[in-house]
Amino acid sequence: MRIGMICPYSFDVPGGVQSHVLQLAEVMRTRGHLVSVLAPASPHAALPDYFVSGGRAVPIPYNGSVARLRFGPATHRKVKKWLAHGDFDVLHLHEPNAPSLSMLALNIAEGPIVATFHTSTTKSLTLTVFQGILRPMHEKIVGRIAVSDLARRWQMEALGSDAVEIPNGVDVDSFASAARLDGYPRQGKTVLFLGRYDEPRKGMAVLLDALPKVVQRFPDVQLLIVGHGDADQLRGQAGRLAAHLRFLGQVDDAGKASAMRSADVYCAPNTGGESFGIVLVEAMAAGTAVVASDLDAFRRVLRDGEVGHLVPVDPPDLQAAALADGLIAVLENDVLRERYVAAGNAAVRRYDWSVVASQIMRVYETVAGSGAKVQVAS
């Protein structure tokens, strides 16, 4: 099968959707399918040979974050050319609601079109502005996928169409077998934070507020930080506790897996804006206990606290105290921590790419059943 995929977000910056698209493309290629991926990227970006750059991206506020997207007349021409020469059996768009390559392609293309919805926000200015345009455009989508129940419900409420729920995929074995970082496990406890720590919704401020109580209980605890942000600024905010912070910066997937394998607990103190907890799944696959905010998306992944510790986020002014208590409870109780690890190991199997890719392929086969090709609309 010839599969065209479009990622709206730039591959110059790591992100969950980018990782999902890259891994899905790789799995489909190993199964013998021909895949071409169109995505924003700068000229110096290191991309596989089956990637086509849609050009440099620009930062646009989206879903409580800053997404790096590509739009405009030149991009329109590039998308049209890519579609015309692709001879695709299926076109798979990711996040077609964002002002991006995906939205452009949905407007230009017709035929067997699949779309995956990753976000669940109901406060999108983009959606408000484009809703009248999006609804008729969405009628062109033959197969709809939502990565979570939240994303599916948002799709139904905002645009009036249903979707099949297929979660994000994880290469479970690669996380389970990853080598630990040099010097780990440490003599003391290690808590891992992963994400763009300069984005408020990722919850680093909450974690810093929780840290004094955790340090009081575990004086040798280390907060291992992976991701993008201003490390010097964060050290300044941590004050006298800055010595407990270790920064790894941005890492590749192998580095992420090693960091997760090296921690006693993975902490996700997010305050909102999440539709699926893919990083929680990765941590569980690595054999690391999870302490996470009690958000709908995280609660679903952690099975209401069965496979990880959930921390109340309301009232907000008490979230840091609750997070500190949760971290201490899991760090000091080896039996509880090992129970979470064992339960997580069993729970993540449904997210393995061997399962998820097969579910997506069934959607492809359904929409491409007529034999019609993806074409540029006349």
Swiss-Prot record:
<dbReference type="GO" id="GO:0000030">
    <property type="term" value="F:mannosyltransferase activity"/>
</dbReference>
<dbReference type="GO" id="GO:0016757">
    <property type="term" value="F:glycosyltransferase activity"/>
</dbReference>
<keyword id="KW-0808">Transferase</keyword>
<comment type="function">
    <text>Involved in the biosynthesis of phosphatidyl-myo-inositol mannosides (PIM) which are early precursors in the biosynthesis of lipomannans (LM) and lipoarabinomannans (LAM). Catalyzes the addition of a mannosyl residue from GDP-D-mannose (GDP-Man) to the position 2 of the carrier lipid phosphatidyl-myo-inositol (PI) to generate a phosphatidyl-myo-inositol bearing an alpha-1,2-linked mannose residue (PIM1). PimA plays an essential role for growth in macrophages and during both the acute and chronic phases of infection.</text>
</comment>
<feature type="binding site">
    <location>
        <position position="256"/>
    </location>
    <ligand>
        <name>GDP-alpha-D-mannose</name>
    </ligand>
</feature>
<keyword id="KW-0328">Glycosyltransferase</keyword>
<dbReference type="InterPro" id="IPR028098">
    <property type="entry name" value="Glyco_trans_4-like_N"/>
</dbReference>
<dbReference type="GO" id="GO:0043750">
    <property type="term" value="F:phosphatidylinositol alpha-mannosyltransferase activity"/>
</dbReference>
<dbReference type="Pfam" id="PF13692">
    <property type="entry name" value="Glyco_trans_1_4"/>
</dbReference>
<comment type="pathway">
    <text>Phospholipid metabolism; phosphatidylinositol metabolism.</text>
</comment>
<dbReference type="InterPro" id="IPR050194">
    <property type="entry name" value="Glycosyltransferase_grp1"/>
</dbReference>
<feature type="binding site">
    <location>
        <begin position="201"/>
        <end position="202"/>
    </location>
    <ligand>
        <name>GDP-alpha-D-mannose</name>
    </ligand>
</feature>
<feature type="binding site">
    <location>
        <begin position="251"/>
        <end position="253"/>
    </location>
    <ligand>
        <name>GDP-alpha-D-mannose</name>
    </ligand>
</feature>
<feature type="binding site">
    <location>
        <position position="282"/>
    </location>
    <ligand>
        <name>GDP-alpha-D-mannose</name>
    </ligand>
</feature>
<dbReference type="GO" id="GO:0005886">
    <property type="term" value="C:plasma membrane"/>
</dbReference>
<keyword id="KW-0594">Phospholipid biosynthesis</keyword>
<dbReference type="GO" id="GO:0004377">
    <property type="term" value="F:GDP-Man:Man3GlcNAc2-PP-Dol alpha-1,2-mannosyltransferase activity"/>
</dbReference>
<keyword id="KW-0460">Magnesium</keyword>
<protein>
    <recommendedName>
        <fullName>Phosphatidyl-myo-inositol mannosyltransferase</fullName>
        <ecNumber>2.4.1.345</ecNumber>
    </recommendedName>
</protein>
<dbReference type="GO" id="GO:0000287">
    <property type="term" value="F:magnesium ion binding"/>
</dbReference>
<keyword id="KW-0444">Lipid biosynthesis</keyword>
<feature type="binding site">
    <location>
        <begin position="274"/>
        <end position="278"/>
    </location>
    <ligand>
        <name>GDP-alpha-D-mannose</name>
    </ligand>
</feature>
<dbReference type="GO" id="GO:0046488">
    <property type="term" value="P:phosphatidylinositol metabolic process"/>
</dbReference>
<keyword id="KW-0472">Membrane</keyword>
<comment type="similarity">
    <text>Belongs to the glycosyltransferase group 1 family. Glycosyltransferase 4 subfamily.</text>
</comment>
<feature type="binding site">
    <location>
        <position position="16"/>
    </location>
    <ligand>
        <name>GDP-alpha-D-mannose</name>
    </ligand>
</feature>
<feature type="site" description="Important for catalytic activity">
    <location>
        <position position="118"/>
    </location>
</feature>
<keyword id="KW-0443">Lipid metabolism</keyword>
<keyword id="KW-0843">Virulence</keyword>
<dbReference type="GO" id="GO:0008654">
    <property type="term" value="P:phospholipid biosynthetic process"/>
</dbReference>
<feature type="binding site">
    <location>
        <position position="196"/>
    </location>
    <ligand>
        <name>GDP-alpha-D-mannose</name>
    </ligand>
</feature>
<keyword id="KW-1003">Cell membrane</keyword>
<dbReference type="Pfam" id="PF13439">
    <property type="entry name" value="Glyco_transf_4"/>
</dbReference>
<keyword id="KW-1208">Phospholipid metabolism</keyword>
<feature type="binding site">
    <location>
        <position position="68"/>
    </location>
    <ligand>
        <name>a 1,2-diacyl-sn-glycero-3-phospho-(1D-myo-inositol)</name>
    </ligand>
</feature>
<feature type="binding site">
    <location>
        <begin position="62"/>
        <end position="63"/>
    </location>
    <ligand>
        <name>a 1,2-diacyl-sn-glycero-3-phospho-(1D-myo-inositol)</name>
    </ligand>
</feature>
<comment type="subunit">
    <text>Monomer.</text>
</comment>
<feature type="binding site">
    <location>
        <position position="18"/>
    </location>
    <ligand>
        <name>a 1,2-diacyl-sn-glycero-3-phospho-(1D-myo-inositol)</name>
    </ligand>
</feature>
<dbReference type="GO" id="GO:0009247">
    <property type="term" value="P:glycolipid biosynthetic process"/>
</dbReference>
<feature type="binding site">
    <location>
        <position position="9"/>
    </location>
    <ligand>
        <name>GDP-alpha-D-mannose</name>
    </ligand>
</feature>
